[in-house]
Amino acid sequence: MLETTNGEASPEDPPLNLKSLSQPPQKRSRTVEDFNRFCSFVLTYAGYIPTPATEERPWTPPSSVSPHRTEESDGWDSSPQLPVPSDPPQPPATSDISTIETFVMKAKSQGGGGNSIMKTGGPIGGSGEQVKKGSRRKRRQLHRGGVTMSDTDTDEEERDKRPAGSLPAPQLPPSAESSRDGGGSSSDTDTQVMDEDIMVESGDDSWDLVTCYCEKPFAGRPMIECNICCTWVHLSCAKIRKSNVPDVYYCQKCRGGRGSGGTALKEEP
């Protein structure tokens, strides 16, 4: 009994190799190189990247030999090796091509997803979503811009359809502005009235009349009358400003004879 317990194993205990074979195989973690190879294959398949001349065959899935097999073999060296069952049949390469085709179709349906991948040149996970969001924002802005343009067009059409009576009020004439400013004095208005009274139309007979001692015709220029001799003299010859026209005026001749007949001049109002 002791020999059987020490030297021989009981038939109930399964062998160690069967325990290790019953565990599911561990999946190999994907690396950045694998992802880059997958992206390059997808882009070449979609036609965004020209196929290099050196590559004769497209990218194929990794071979059946995986690193976890070597790790398992390293751990089995201590135990006696048993016949290893064959690996489960892997799906054909057509499944990978079908997934790539669906990926390309989705990218095209989303409005140039492949172009966004080309622009980013990095992983598809985060940057691709950001590019998609940016393209959506641009589309919204363009749509909003089109709406605003249509609104402006309608506003212009409404302005064209408005009647003439709805136009803004015309500007006031300069005379009203001058009256508002209040810069003009009452004397200026008086002189303007006097000038208008003195001015004569060109068709009148007095237009060519010569009365001033300058021997020049009236010609419509403002003149003043002497209170003694009743002679009309140009204001420019009498050196009188239009803004300061006196009520009583004496010409040069009357002023010269004022010394002898000064009493008569004083009697006149």
From Swiss-Prot:
Task: Reply yes or no: does the keyword Zinc apply.
Answer: yes
Q: Which GO terms describe its cellular component?
A: cytoplasm; nucleus
InterPro entries for the chain: Zinc_finger_PHD-type_CS, Znf_FYVE_PHD, Znf_PHD, Znf_PHD-finger, Znf_RING/FYVE/PHD
Signal peptide positions are: none
Q: Which GO terms describe its biological process?
A: autophagy; negative regulation of autophagosome assembly; negative regulation of autophagosome maturation; positive regulation of protein ubiquitination
Q: Name one GO molecular function term.
A: zinc ion binding
What UniProt keywords apply to this chain's record, in alphabetical order?
Answer: Autophagy, Cytoplasm, Metal-binding, Nucleus, Zinc, Zinc-finger
Please quote what the entry notes about the protein's domains.
The PHD-type zinc-finger domain is required for negative regulation of autophagy.
Q: Could you identify this protein by its name?
A: PHD finger protein 23B
Please tell me the species this chain comes from. Xenopus laevis (African clawed frog)
